[in-house]
């Protein structure tokens, strides 16, 4: 039992004031790869892995000041599997009694070349799942048990890691079966056509960094928080951690022994792919590399990782001038219950029509194998839309694990969805903290899915209504809950009134 932590919590309850205390920091990283013939996650159609291109990793960072704590757990996966978080937390409760298991924030890099446990043959899936749990628990345990007195610094830089991938047209476009509701927007749509109007929204130019040091001021690691989902190699047939492998290689060359922990900021509609200027990009790569890529996305991965490294160095050059060894930490963990997405009559009819078309495609001998393997996923989406519409008055609110954390003048807010960039803007703009890191795809109590804004939902297309378990109103509920908690945490700086 941690008497110091219990005493500090009791004091906080009495005074309502947070106090600075010495930081302890620990890092760990472990491999969660497999070279077995698994199915890859990230697309409606199935992709059978041909092997391992580069390793998947689980990175943990523990920060503790004796009063409160956090363990960030970043995994190269499409989203945090519920069973992994549940099993790891059970082991933590049993084997690491001084670490509150709810203070672990599980989050994913959203790669599209990781393992699809649900599609992989059961025996192999069970084997990989057990291995993954063991390795992730090991990262948590090693990070927690390796904590030493340390310091942090923080900063940001501006860097292009992603673009908005929703192309808007002057007129409605036909939707896709079980994927895209009809509307004016198309994910990855063509921009070189007369009907092109604009790119729907922006993308996050900010890269947020939290740097860690030992007590001698030596850099030991950093959180890299960017509005970028690493899925450049989405067409690959090999297990890969995508851009984060390239970034780890660059860090090993330029900053040997320094850990990095990737976090994806709100970036539900972000992509590596430029919405236009594509011919110019191809020419650029031809002149830089003078050859064809060795594997899908090779050049984009290298370029994005290189830009992040340059950004990292720029931010660190000035952020390191102000290090902190004693800081207040407060970590709030709640379950939010969010407004569910209720399909419209138009989407209901489209989903019913989609089920009919899927049945026809199954019977058609000309249906390609690629399309055939996508029909189960598309059909499940259509069934969910139909069921939700027919039970609209009985739909429960959607639970979501929710973390709000402050470490000094830096704050973190997590949510479990592919959260559109504008929601993240709303949180950061209204936060009372100097820097606020948003973390998407970070939870353990249910699947993710997109969470689109009001504007995006009205425009339709992939990544909106069909694939959103929570409504735009629910997205704003996260914003309001985050701002409320952030203001409450900031208010703890002030002495309690007598």
Question: Where on the chain are the PLM-derived regions?
Answer:
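Bacterial N-terminal signal peptides
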Residues: 7-17
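N-terminal secretory signal peptides that target proteins for export/translocation
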Residues: 1-3
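Conserved beta-alpha junction segments in alpha/beta enzyme cores
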Residues: 21-304, 309, 316, 320-498
